[in-house]
Amino acid sequence: MRVLASHKHERTAQAIKEAVAAIISREVKDPRLGFVSVTKVDLARDLSQAKIYISVYGSEEDKKNSFIALNSAKGFIKGELASRVRLRIMPELYFVEDPSIEYGARIMEILEGLKKEAGENESES
């Protein structure tokens, strides 16, 4: 029974992720909202809270403005979510910055730098 409950929990989190992504991209009309993507949703066991991980492409100012826009549209997003995903209790939404894409980009920069250094060292030898 535990595996079934876990699977249902994952499906619910995925449904929330897809719905929130669609709402943000198509319904939220705030000019402060930059290029954002929903990367992950962590759902509390009792479905009372949903941490929505957001990746924002752009400068620190773009990130700040995007999170301000998301937090001001939180009520609207929750209402739209309630009409799209049928849950007995609609979770409280929390938008959290997901640094994983930036982290991955930084790793790629480091690897490219190492690759260039290795190429320069081979040409000097």
From Swiss-Prot:
The record's section on InterPro entries has:
KH_dom-like_a/b (IPR015946), RbfA (IPR000238), RbfA_dom_sf (IPR023799), Ribosome-bd_factorA_CS (IPR020053)
Q: Which UniProt keywords apply?
A: Cytoplasm, Ribosome biogenesis
Q: Out of the domains of life, which is the source?
A: Bacteria
Q: Name one GO biological process term.
A: maturation of SSU-rRNA
Which Pfam families is this protein grouped with? RBFA
Q: Where in the cell is it found?
A: Cytoplasm
What PROSITE patterns would the database entry show? Answer: RBFA (PS01319)
- Cross-referenced SUPFAM superfamilies: Ribosome-binding factor A, RbfA
Task: Give me the Gene Ontology terms describing cellular component.
Answer: cytosol
Chief localization class? cytoplasm
Q: Which residues form a coiled coil?
A: none
Citing just one GO molecular function, the answer is:
ribosomal small subunit binding
- Keyword Secreted in record: no
Described purpose of this protein according to its UniProt entry: One of several proteins that assist in the late maturation steps of the functional core of the 30S ribosomal subunit. Associates with free 30S ribosomal subunits (but not with 30S subunits that are part of 70S ribosomes or polysomes). Required for efficient processing of 16S rRNA. May interact with the 5'-terminal helix region of 16S rRNA.
Quaternary state and interactors: Monomer. Binds 30S ribosomal subunits, but not 50S ribosomal subunits or 70S ribosomes.
Query: Which family would the database say this protein is a member of?
Result: Belongs to the RbfA family.
Query: Which PANTHER family does the record match to this protein?
Result: RIBOSOME-BINDING FACTOR A, CHLOROPLASTIC-RELATED
UniProt-recorded name of the protein: Ribosome-binding factor A
